[in-house]
């Protein structure tokens, strides 16, 4: 047989076939799909069920670098979860602090701090001519519920972020519990309230009561370092009577001087409602054609909140026994701030009988035969505002009892300037709940604008209410004191770091405070009450309660029985009288 060459062998092969493995790749192995892989790949898991889905291409350059940049080219999974974990990975290691924390003493535990003197009838005292203003609720009937834990970003709440599921959710209790015999009539969210508007009326003075001392202008000077003045606790007779118990308002109502009656502290809360976060309540009494905006006995509306609008507001902390263990809780801070405001207004005036300014009538709530403490500097101005619209058949007038705290000589001459005096307080700039505030001792005079701007953000509702009260009273200026604790761990001693003055209208513009929106809210509530009782008998007394929801930016209007809260008031009075008798013994 003749030998064959390689060329002959190749030529003898079929032309349609090729030598070697098949060129098309088959992704099926015995009917099971599989993906090509490299034996050099280290697989940590059989499958990745946690990989990104439709959002894998979102996130921009950083997301691309994080997800795709350093992956293996051949045979790698689409997530780093396919990579084997290093045995000595310490990324999840953390250090636990097991040091003991010292227990802090609570400010005014077990009740409210009382402005010293006899009477002690509470904040919303009954009987127009008796009782001192009380700082706290005192009776423990839910006054502290108003300041329970809050959501993080004011009345808007906030969206959840990384690991927020693992954080304790903040919930608050209502300022007053809704009873079974109450009927809800209306629910309005703050977005709707913010759209209301009524041209702000100027108002006119009807009468004035009380007297004022002159403001001590030495407090306007920057204090010497480490030589600040201490805040003093002064014994003065101060009154905070609700609307329907005011004898002057009762007299004006009998003369048909107006249809709606209120006090500036109650009205300011209603006008600034969209800025509020904590729960509050207002009692509305409709008797005949008269409407009274009242506050109940022990209402939290009179307490001064602290950092209510801060992104990280103070929280309630309780131990296993349920007792408050911190002086920086919302309820403790509110008692402290109310005490500071009362005493600061008394301390910053020059008590001189020769130079005081006396109004047309004496203080309507003071009885010299019964009281032993001297009367505090306070002027009450009863002012009337026209809330009428063009389509109204009859005018709608509102009388408001406004307050001023002091007078000051006009620096350019002319009439004396009337002032309202308020105080902002710093508890601890490094503590939780401080809202990122600057250290007042070092920054108040060098960065005053930044300090005030931070307070506008953290205490929006408080400053808005004070500004509204000043405008309602037609005050010429506001004096804001900056007061800090002498020791951050003690709530009993305070120092005055400085005082800053503002004109109310200019301060309102800086805060973006729209009084037209506030008057629109008031007129809307009044119209709703009048429409509900349009078919009722004239002499029939109807009572309503307006409540701010503790956890949502919503207010609700309830119809309640006429005797609601009266039994609580009588029980509180009996308890206070019994306590007075025991103290005298």
From Swiss-Prot:
Q: Which Pfam families match?
A: eIF-3_zeta (PF05091)
Q: Where would you find this protein in the cell?
A: Cytoplasm
Q: From what superkingdom does this record's organism come?
A: Eukaryota
Give me the ranges of the annotated region RNA gate: 300-314
Basic and acidic residues biased stretches: 43-60
**InterPro entries according to UniProt:** eIF3d
Subunit-structure text: Component of the eukaryotic translation initiation factor 3 (eIF-3) complex.
Q: Which family does it belong to?
A: Belongs to the eIF-3 subunit D family.
Q: What is known of its domains?
A: The RNA gate region regulates mRNA cap recognition to prevent promiscuous mRNA-binding before assembly of eif3d into the full eukaryotic translation initiation factor 3 (eIF-3) complex.
Q: What is this protein called?
A: Eukaryotic translation initiation factor 3 subunit D
What is the scientific name of the source organism? Neosartorya fischeri (strain ATCC 1020 / DSM 3700 / CBS 544.65 / FGSC A1164 / JCM 1740 / NRRL 181 / WB 181) (Aspergillus fischerianus)
């Amino acid at each position: 047989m003749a030998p064959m060459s390689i060329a002959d062998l190749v030529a003898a092969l079929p032309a349609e076939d090729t030598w070697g493995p098949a060129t098309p790749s088959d992704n099926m192995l015995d009917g099971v799909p599989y993906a090509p892989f490299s034996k050099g790949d280290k697989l940590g898991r059989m499958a990745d069920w946690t990989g990104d889905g439709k959002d894998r291409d979102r996130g921009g350059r950083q997301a691309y670098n994080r997800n795709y940049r350093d992956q293996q080219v051949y045979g790698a999974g689409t997530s780093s979860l396919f990579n084997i974990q290093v045995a000595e990975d310490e990324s999840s290691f953390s250090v636990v602090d097991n040091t003991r924390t010292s227990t802090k003493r609570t400010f005014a535990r077990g009740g409210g701090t009382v402005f010293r003197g006899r009477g002690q009838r509470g904040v919303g005292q009954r009987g127009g001519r008796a009782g001192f203003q009380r700082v706290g609720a005192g009776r423990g009937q839910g006054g502290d519920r108003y300041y329970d834990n809050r959501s993080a970003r004011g009345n808007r709440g906030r969206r959840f972020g990384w690991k927020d599921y693992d954080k304790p959710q903040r919930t608050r209790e209502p300022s007053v519990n809704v009873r079974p015999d109450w009927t809800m009539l209306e629910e309005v969210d703050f977005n709707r309230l913010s759209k209301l508007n009524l041209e702000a009326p100027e108002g006119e003075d009807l009468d004035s009561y009380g007297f004022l001392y002159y403001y001590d202008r030495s407090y306007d000077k920057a204090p010497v370092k480490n030589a600040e003045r201490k805040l003093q606790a002064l014994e003065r007779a101060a009154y905070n009577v609700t609307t329907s118990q005011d004898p002057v308002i009762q007299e004006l109502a009998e003369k048909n001087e107006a249809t709606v009656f209120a006090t500036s502290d109650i009205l300011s809360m209603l006008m600034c409602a969209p800025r509020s976060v904590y729960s509050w309540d207002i009692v509305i009494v409709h008797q005949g054609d008269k409407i009274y905006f009242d506050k109940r006995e022990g209402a939290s509306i009179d307490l001064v909140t602290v950092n209510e609008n801060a992104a990280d507001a103070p929280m309630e902390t309780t131990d296993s026994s349920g007792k408050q263990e911190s002086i920086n809780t919302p309820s403790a801070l509110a008692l402290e701030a109310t005490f500071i405001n009362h005493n600061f207004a008394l301390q910053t005036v020059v008590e001189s009988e020769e130079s005081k300014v006396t109004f047309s009538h004496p203080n309507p709530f003071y009885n010299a035969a019964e009281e032993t403490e001297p009367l505090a500097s306070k002027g009450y101005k009863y002012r009337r505002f026209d809330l009428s619209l063009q389509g109204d058949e009859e005018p709608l007038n509102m009388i408001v009892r406004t307050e001023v705290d002091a007078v000051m000589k006009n620096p350019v001459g002319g009439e004396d300037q009337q002032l309202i005096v308020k105080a902002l307080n710093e508890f601890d700039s490094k503590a939780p709940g401080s809202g990122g505030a600057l250290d007042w001792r070092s920054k108040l005079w060098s960065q005053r604008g930044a300090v005030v701007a931070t307070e506008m953000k953290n205490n929006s509702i408080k400053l808005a209410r004070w500004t509204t009260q000043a405008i309602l009273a037609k005050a010429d200026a506001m004096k804001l004191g900056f007061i800090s604790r002498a020791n951050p761990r003690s709530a009993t001693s305070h120092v005055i770091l400085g005082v800053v003055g503002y004109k109310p209208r200019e301060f309102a513009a800086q805060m973006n405070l729209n009084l037209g929106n506030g008057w629109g809210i008031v007129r809307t509530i009044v119209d709703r009450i009048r429409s509900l009782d349009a078919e009722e008998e004239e002499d029939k007394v109807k009572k309503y309660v307006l409540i701010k929801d503790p956890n949502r930016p919503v207010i609700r209007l309830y119809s309640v029985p006429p005797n609601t809260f009266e039994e609580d008031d009588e029980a509180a009075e009996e308890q206070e009288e019994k306590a007075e008798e025991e103290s005298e013994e």
